[in-house]
Regions:
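Residue-level detector of flexible, active-site-proximal loop/helix-junction positions
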Residues: 12, 87, 107, 167
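Acidic-glycine-rich active-site phosphate/pyrophosphate-binding loop
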Residues: 94-112, 156-164
Length: 185
């Protein structure tokens, strides 16, 4: 079997007709590309289109802490896998203390410690890791393989890339951030 993983832009989502991902994800929706989409409502609708051909047999990973993705959860045609960086969830992935947990069917399992098991910093990367866990487990990847991969993963160039520490201040290069919300996170 061949698995393809692709980031689909809102521009590409405007023209999809038959695209049917088995697993999709919307990590966040913030004001962006409004020069093209004109209103936030239009932009949100285009982002949600990634699920238009999905069914309950498919999965959509959504960020519970983003107002737009949280509101979409009830309308989403796929089985939703939530993640949260700010609260404990009854079902889904969540970050609490320094750990990432998976809550499912009344059981809570500690998956990893972000300080010792991740080579990335920042809440945005914790959210990215939770989304990646949700995507991979929904695709049937064994949890051990997922966690081993996360432990080995290092930051890529221009994405919260460590530069130096001077006089107790840590400097990072995050020049790939495409909007103010991305830079702040």
């Amino acid at each position: 079997d061949t698995v393809s993983v692709a980031e689909i832009s809102s521009f590409q989502l405007e023209t999809i007709e038959y695209f049917h991902p088995q697993v999709s994800a919307i990590l966040n929706i913030t004001p962006d590309h409004l020069n093209r989409h004109h209103t936030m409502e239009n932009y949100v609708a285009v982002k949600e289109a990634i699920t238009m051909n999905q069914t309950k047999d498919d999965y959509c990973i959504l960020n519970y802490e983003n107002e737009y993705t949280r509101n979409f959860g009830d309308r989403c045609p796929a089985t939703v896998v939530w993640f949260s960086s700010a609260r404990r969830l009854d079902n889904g992935l969540f970050y609490e203390g320094e750990d990432i947990y998976l809550a499912k069917d009344g059981n809570v399992q500690r998956l990893m410690n972000v300080k010792t098991d991740m080579n990335l910093v920042g809440i945005c990367n914790i959210e990215n890791v939770m989304a990646a866990i949700g995507i991979a487990m929904s695709a049937g990847v064994p949890m051990k393989n997922i966690l081993d991969t996360i432990r080995r993963f290092v930051a890529v160039e221009h994405r919260i890339e460590y530069v130096a520490t001077k006089k107790g201040v840590v400097y990072y290069n995050d020049s790939k951030a495409t909007n103010t919300d991305a830079a702040i996170q």
